[in-house]
A protein has these predicted regions:
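Fe(II)/2-oxoglutarate oxygenase catalytic core
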Residues: 135, 153-326, 335-384
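Short coil/loop residues immediately preceding or within conserved phosphate-binding loops
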Residues: 17, 127-128, 262, 295, ...
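Chalcogenol-based redox active-site neighborhoods
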Residues: 2-165
């Protein structure tokens, strides 16, 4: 079967680049969606043993300074297991990584390998090319390998000519976030902080997907925070009433969305003494969190430095909301909390979702690991 008879995915400028999870030479599980927030250069070269691939990788090596994980990063995609076993390819951080795509799953997604590749098929016809993605992981331009130079210099010249990532549209674009002042009164914020202080909270983890299960993971390199779950019925009902009265109407107006459920009533603390922070992440990327629709972040105090809320897909700006002000945003947005450098940042951090998402959450109980509490919904369970 010839190359032209095979079916290949075709990506064009403006198309969203497919997300995937794959191993790199230094990471057993790398979620590509977390690369957003900078220009991304992808190179589908097949095997580093190939002279054309060597020329491409040589061009990257000569331009090492371009890839700092701030303005830009590079991902090479190899289909050759010998590239890893021989040590020909190694991640060099910051900025340069290699995906071990030995099952051609990435190559199929991006059109480097035919989408109809059969398991165990030998001599897969490979299309070698470069892709440059914008900070939102949309395709900007593709470059084919061509001749001895392989078009490699053209890719790098194009990258160097791009504006700063914050100005890729020609102007700064604010993140799609609702900022709602006075959701919590100052006195109510103090009551929530007092409830946290009386308990002290526990170390907070985050959800990961492994072997089809959603698991809780603790990793202070990714997240350092302590959480306290509210137990006082008066405080819980006070939170619920204020969200229903002051956040839900704005969600209906702006997003035509009506929340009917709140996940977790927690007061959280990012402390400078602990190196409090949360690296870039999305809140709904596992089966156990897929129901989450909107995240809410309400600052309960302002006597701290650092701890800004940022959205890397929309630039490097971070936000420090006034006391009682809510930031409300889609759980699909990449976001982070910068390190707190002085004092403590206290925040109330629930997730909102609707009836359909509640049914999804209930059905996904079977995907929860043993360390994740099973979801119960009396309303849905009674209805069934």
């Amino acid at each position: 079967m010839t190359d032209t008879a095979r079916r290949y995915v075709a990506l064009h400028p403006g198309d969203p680049a497919p997300w995937f999870v794959q191993r790199t030479t230094s990471s057993p599980r790398f979620g590509f969606d977390l690369a957003a927030g900078r220009y991304v250069v992808l190179c589908f070269f097949g095997s580093a043993a190939d002279p054309a691939a060597q020329a491409a990788l040589g061009a990257i090596a000569r331009s090492r300074a371009e890839f700092d994980d701030e303005r830009a990063c590079f991902f090479g995609i190899t289909l050759d297991p010998a590239d890893e076993s021989s040590g020909r390819l190694r991640d060099t951080l910051p900025g340069i990584r290699f995906f071990c795509d030995f099952d051609a799953s990435i190559a199929r997604l991006y059109g480097a390998a035919p989408s109809d590749v059969r398991p165990g098929e030998k001599q897969v016809p490979l299309r070698r090319f470069w892709l440059v993605l914008d900070p939102g992981l949309r395709v900007m331009r593709a470059f084919a390998f061509a001749g001895a130079g392989g078009g490699h210099n053209a890719v790098l010249d194009y990258l160097r000519a791009l504006p700063p990532p914050d100005l890729v549209q020609g102007f700064a674009v604010p993140p799609p976030v609702l900022f709602l002042p006075n959701v919590f009164e100052a006195e109510f914020c103090r009551d929530l902080i007092a409830a946290y202080e009386a308990d002290g909270g526990t170390e907070s983890g985050f959800m990961v997907e492994a072997d089809g299960k959603t698991l809780m993971q603790l990793d202070p390199r990714q997240k350092r925070r302590r959480d306290f779950s509210l137990q006082d019925p008066q405080l819980v009902s006070g939170v619920q009433a204020r969200i229903e009265r002051r956040i839900a109407p704005e969600l209906r107006k702006v997003h035509q969305f009506t929340p009917t459920r709140i996940e977790r009533c927690i007061v959280s603390c990012y402390a400078a003494a602990d190196g409090g922070h949360f690296s870039a992440h999305r809140d709904n990327r596992s089966k156990g969190t897929a129901h989450r629709q909107f995240a809410v972040s309400i600052n309960l105090n302002d006597d701290f430095d650092g701890g800004g809320l940022g959205f890397p897909e929309y630039g490097g700006q971070t936000f420090k909301m006034p006391v009682g002000c809510a930031a409300v945003f889609s759980c699909s947005l990449l976001h982070r909390v910068t390190p707190v450098t002085r004092g403590r940042r206290y925040a109330f951090l629930p997730f909102l979702y609707d009836d359909a998402a509640a049914r999804l959450r209930l059905s996904n109980n079977r995907f929860l690991g043993d360390d994740v509490p099973v979801y119960q919904d009396p309303i849905l369970e009674d209805a069934s």
